């Protein structure tokens, strides 16, 4: 476990070593720290897109974890994620040498010192919403710094050190580490049961989110989605200034007159003073993304920015990689990849996909974590209502040990039991999957790959499979 003191001031060290630097969150923090002139090194078990990004920027990354690495780089501080066990040889050596060990979120908090910090949290939607916020501020010429758990399209990075006064941070609730942050404005998109490997249940999750919302202080603002009235009540229980947003007239900021044109969404946002502003989102379809955009415009409102200029800037948002990302087309089949790995995310994405006019919406889903599948199996089974065909591949463990009986085949059986008319296939190998897809998916269909694991490779592999057969 990392040292527990909260970071409330700018970093006073000169060098930092990141154990597990290849993750989406860790790599962004390391990149921004490097861009600010600190000496940054890191290590991870294997190379990745994020590590290649860091290497190009000039960060030295060791592949593999060895105690000797700590002796070599002699960092002033070591940064770890909760995925790093106490037995990690680099962590053990750092402790032996008395080097301070910081959790990822403490370093994130330190990087936000001296900035107006906007922190975006929620069970779903936080990566897209924080990316929208960073894009809006940047396209308004405000040059924000940002740290986000995904690659922001148009910037090709998950972290950026800007010269402006604003700092946008995706706040991770998965291990309560977002409690290290010191935000001025908070967005909470939703609160649901998830990460039950860390939390005892929804009550503990809600209590932790309430603590997080309290971090803004009495002069801050908490922006919450009013589609869940209980979330609004939870936010107001903190005694902080709360603004709710949503489609219902009861909200402080109202999303009105939604008009979906393919993947483009047009709508109106009305503020408390009655002023109305037209908004256009050219990527990331669906009502849930209209809500995300409304939350971001509310940030502009709270910061005293010109709302029409903010809406125009927001219209240039190009999306986030692995959030309804177009992979390619082959034989009249459109292939899209999406990170959705929780039932609510899946429902929202499929609702958006079903409105796009494809002949069929066919899904390849890879459950992420045995604990999540065990806790939410029935919810997963119901989440695929808008999928015409469902293909399941083996669980991506994310480092968890298997739980006896908790498998993708179990989920397939549950879907069949609850929805007998649904076409469901479990595939035990990628070859079997490609063969099934070849038979099941046709011209005019949307093939949607979903999950937080390596299911992202399914789309490109299927395109290569069909291309090779055509060229043979």
Please give the residue ranges for each predicted region.
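Adenine nucleotide phosphate-binding catalytic loops in nucleotide-utilizing enzymes
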Residues: 11-15, 19, 54, 199-206, ...
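Phosphate-binding loop of NTP-binding sites
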Residues: 8, 32-35, 55, 69-70, ...
